[in-house]
């Protein structure tokens, strides 16, 4: 047992040295825009913003702007927060004593004295900013680097594979999967890869005819170029590419923006599908990762190039935006849940009920962090 933990520690200490800078680069971009969403809508709604912090804990460096907001970088770079006038904590829990003794002028700038719709808009602005950031990043990547458009042609069918059982033949070109247009081999790989065990309907061009096939991708463990193991859906089809076969299509900014929206929705859809699969037992929870895993992936992706690292930032931005919308007290979604109840009841929940909710939310978040970190350590030790 001691050897296992020693090996884990050595893997962590050796690996994280090369991962810290890319990790902080990615996380800082995502957190900054999340908090900027809260900040901008709060200012628009007339709320006085006391603090805009990247990180938690003691302040390392900061300054005050002309509106009295303290902008700072804090010691623990694993998130951030915006603190409003009237907040008791960084999680925007109210300070009953402060709220009770406010003057009319102070109430005008207090977050907790705003109408429930304004408060909901301020809270929702963080996750929305994450989604918008992802759309813009994806769109920029499509604009500057183009869109893969190598046809989804079948050059080889693995014997005994799902593709063989479905009736695929060499020379087939996949046109659509479950009605979704397939424009490239990578399009097909992405859909098949996340739908192991699901029956899929394929529209296939075979010579001059169009045929319909049904196949169920099988789940296999595949290693990426960095040695990380992923469980993916596989048909057993190979596309052999020669010089000139790999085509990248340039797209205009408007098309790139639409592709950015589609890419963002794809990440949202697959993330929700994975979470649903964990709860139903179809997916293993060992793929849930925390800061250590993100740091490792950031360092690995950084070796490919800045475009790949920025792409990772977009994916992480979607994930953080989505996570924050979960109806768990302490997260943005928990606040929105409370505001929804307040809108229906015509008055907020009692202080005791809200405090109990935040305690439960804190417990759930801490348990998730411990579980994710445990997974991270096992993953790093194995690699």
Identify the residue ranges that each predicted region occupies.
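Functional transmembrane alpha-helices
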Residues: 2-14, 101, 105-117, 221-322, ...
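Conserved PDZ fold ligand-binding element
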Residues: 163-185, 264, 357
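PDZ-domain C-terminal substructure recognizer with occasional recognition of PDZ-binding tails
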Residues: 169, 175-176, 190-231
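Small-residue-rich helix-interface/hinge motifs
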Residues: 15-99, 323-345
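Hydrophobic membrane-targeting alpha-helices
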Residues: 136-144, 321, 325, 369-376
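Pore domain of cation channels
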Residues: 123-132, 312-325
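Alpha-helical transmembrane segments of integral membrane proteins
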Residues: 22-26, 31, 311, 315, ...
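Internal alpha-helical transmembrane segments
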Residues: 33, 44, 80, 84-91, ...
């Amino acid at each position: 047992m001691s050897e296992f933990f020693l090996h884990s520690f050595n893997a962590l200490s050796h690996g994280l040295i090369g991962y810290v800078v890319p990790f902080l680069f990615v996380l800082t971009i995502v957190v900054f825009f999340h908090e900027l969403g809260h900040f901008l809508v709060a200012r628009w709604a007339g709320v006085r913003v006391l603090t805009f912090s990247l990180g938690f804990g003691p302040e390392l460096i900061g300054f005050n702007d002309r509106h009295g907001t303290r902008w700072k970088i804090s010691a623990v770079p694993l998130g951030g927060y915006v603190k409003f006038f009237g907040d008791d904590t960084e999680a925007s829990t109210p300070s009953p004593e402060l709220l009770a003794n406010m003057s009319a002028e102070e109430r005008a700038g207090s977050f907790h004295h705003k109408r429930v719709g304004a408060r909901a808009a301020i809270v929702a602005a963080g996750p929305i900013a994450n989604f918008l950031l992802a759309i813009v990043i994806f769109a920029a990547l499509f604009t500057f680097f183009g869109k893969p458009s190598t046809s989804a042609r079948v050059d080889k069918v693995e014997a005994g594979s799902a593709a063989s059982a479905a009736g695929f033949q060499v020379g087939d070109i996949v046109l659509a999967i479950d009605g979704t247009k397939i424009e490239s081999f990578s399009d097909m790989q992405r859909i098949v890869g996340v739908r192991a065990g699901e029956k899929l309907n394929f529209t296939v061009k075979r010579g001059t005819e169009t045929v319909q096939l049904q196949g169920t991708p099988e789940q296999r463990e595949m290693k990426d170029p960095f040695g990380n193991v992923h469980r993916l859906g596989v048909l057993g089809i190979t596309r052999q590419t020669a010089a000139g076969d790999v085509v990248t299509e340039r797209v205009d900014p408007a098309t790139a923006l639409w592709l950015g929206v589609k890419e963002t929705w794809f990440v949202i859809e697959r993330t929700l599908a994975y979470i649903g699969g964990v709860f139903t037992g179809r997916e293993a929870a060992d793929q849930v990762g925390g800061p250590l895993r993100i740091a490792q992936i950031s360092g690995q992706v950084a070796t490919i190039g800045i475009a790949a690292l920025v792409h990772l930032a977009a994916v992480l931005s979607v994930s953080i935006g989505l996570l924050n919308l979960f109806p768990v007290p302490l997260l943005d979604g928990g606040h929105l849940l409370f505001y929804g109840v307040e809108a229906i009841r015509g008055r907020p929940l009692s202080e005791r009920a809200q405090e109990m909710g935040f305690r439960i939310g804190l417990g759930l978040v801490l348990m998730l962090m411990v579980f994710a970190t445990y997974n991270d350590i096992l993953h790093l030790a194995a690699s």
